[in-house]
Design a protein with these regions (language model features):
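Short Cys/His-centered divalent metal-binding micro-motifs
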Residues: 91-114
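Low-complexity, glycine/serine/proline-rich disordered segments
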Residues: 1-43, 48-58, 114
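Histidine-centered nuclease catalytic patch
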Residues: 51-98
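Alpha-helical architecture
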Residues: 22, 64-65, 106
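Structural recognition of the beta-strand scaffold that forms the well-ordered cores
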Residues: 43, 64, 101-103
Length: 114
């Protein structure tokens, strides 16, 4: 998808200007597995609340792919839009499970814990 992006006085038509890449196969499941505690449960890192989900089911409304504090999407997207990352580098970064943690949607989308 290529959309125009107004940045100062120039227009960019880069992929992912106004949308995010899709996750590659296995990324979501790996993030989930990486987040399991010693008891096998996944908890929201902000509140400690247990997140109940079964891989293969929709995670819509159950949990979000929250970025870890060191991997803030807006900063990487800005670097990509400014030409500091190629499209491949941006998409590869986006699909690195190490950049994510499961978060409850309300906590992730509110940016309350950033």
């Amino acid at each position: 998808m290529c959309l125009a992006y107004q940045s100062g006085s120039k227009t960019n038509t880069k992929p992912y200007t106004n949308s995010r890449p899709s996750f590659r196969k296995g990324v979501v499941e790996q993030v989930w597995e990486n987040a399991k505690g010693p008891d096998g449960l996944v908890r929201d890192p902000n509140t400690g609340e247990v997140i109940n989900w079964t891989p293969g089911e929709s995670r819509k409304g159950v949990w979000d792919m929250g970025h870890i504090p060191e991997a803030k999407y807006s900063k990487r997207h800005e670097a990509y839009m400014n030409g500091k990352l190629t499209t491949k580098e941006f998409v590869d970064w986006y699909n690195d499970p190490a950049n994510y943690r499961p978060e409850l949607p309300s906590n992730n989308r509110s940016h309350k814990y950033e």
